[in-house]
Amino acid sequence: MDRKELLSKPVQDLRIDGNTTLSNLMAQFSNIGGFTAAKLYEAHSIISDMFLEDNTTFLSFPADIISTGLRGLINDVVKRKLVDVIITTSGTLDHDIARTFGKYYCGSFNYSDVELREININRLGNVLVPDESYGELIEEKVMEQLEKLYSIKKEWATVDLIKEIGLSINNESSILYNAAKNDIPIFVPGITDGSFGSQLWSFYEQHHDFKINLLEDEHRLSDIIFDAKKTGAIMVGGGISKHHTIWWNQFRDGLDYAVYITTAQEYDGSLSGAKLEEAISWKKVRPNARFVNIYGDATVIMPILMAPFL
């Protein structure tokens, strides 16, 4: 260690007034010293390069955040074509469709779930999802489109099916619609794990020649990976969305840029808790990559991190 180099950047106090913008604040985070704020600045710097360079940018996230107002921010990112590929879960399709045509409500973590069940309200953290805004609504919208798409052809790649259903939504508030309109593919490797997937199963029960070609999705992903000069990923939360993103990037020796936002810890060996450092050993992140792990609630972190780019 070089003492002079280590002591080259003094900690500076924040200066905030009525004229301070998020961009100003982010710039001040570069000299704040501790703790998560410094990581936010590092993430901002990485994402800036990710967006500026000839880079294929992945965005991965779980479904729960789409039940919140963070859906609007994700939608704006998609509208501005800041990312090239989305990898997510079946529940994202559910919540995006449901909130396009119905309403979710602000609630509390502390409500009685037994009582909520009795009055047909589902609780997702502190978000309330009434029955009429979810199951039957999604069934109606998806089944209507499946009938139309089935009349065109019997076999569909999931990524194509999602695009066609997205276009049919024709509503600017919808992530699916704007992704389809802007040719940003949405990959859902666990497509059957949600209401959208249940509609696919139900439709198959009535039409046994209806087929979902998941391997075609993987073929499309392989083309994206092998054609990319560089790749970067903004990963919100873990699970299948994060893993599918880093899994495919191992076939090009790993991501060049990565930002991972999580609340999970690594002590239990879980994928969600695994730091990006661990992914280097699996060749899913390059040893010389620029990356950062940020611990915190995505509904707080993402608006602060992404607002300067919008």
UniProtKB/Swiss-Prot annotation:
Pathway as given in its UniProt record: Protein modification; eIF5A hypusination
Transcription regulation among keywords: no
Database matches in PANTHER family: DEOXYHYPUSINE SYNTHASE
GO MF annotation: an example: deoxyhypusine synthase activity
Function: Catalyzes the NAD-dependent oxidative cleavage of spermidine and the subsequent transfer of the butylamine moiety of spermidine to the epsilon-amino group of a specific lysine residue of the eIF-5A precursor protein to form the intermediate deoxyhypusine residue.
Protein name as catalogued: Probable deoxyhypusine synthase
SUPFAM superfamilies: DHS-like NAD/FAD-binding domain
Cofactor(s) the protein needs: NAD(+)
InterPro entries: Deoxyhypus_synthase_arc (IPR022899), Deoxyhypusine_synthase (IPR002773), Deoxyhypusine_synthase_sf (IPR036982), DHS-like_NAD/FAD-binding_dom (IPR029035)
Reaction(s) catalysed by this chain's protein: [eIF5A protein]-L-lysine + spermidine = [eIF5A protein]-deoxyhypusine + propane-1,3-diamine
EC code(s) of this entry: 2.5.1.46
Cross-referenced NCBIfam families: PRK01221.1
GO CC annotations on file: cytoplasm
Keyword set, alphabetical order: Hypusine biosynthesis, NAD, Transferase
Family affiliation: Belongs to the deoxyhypusine synthase family.
Source organism per UniProt: Thermoplasma volcanium (strain ATCC 51530 / DSM 4299 / JCM 9571 / NBRC 15438 / GSS1)
Active site: 284 (nucleophile)
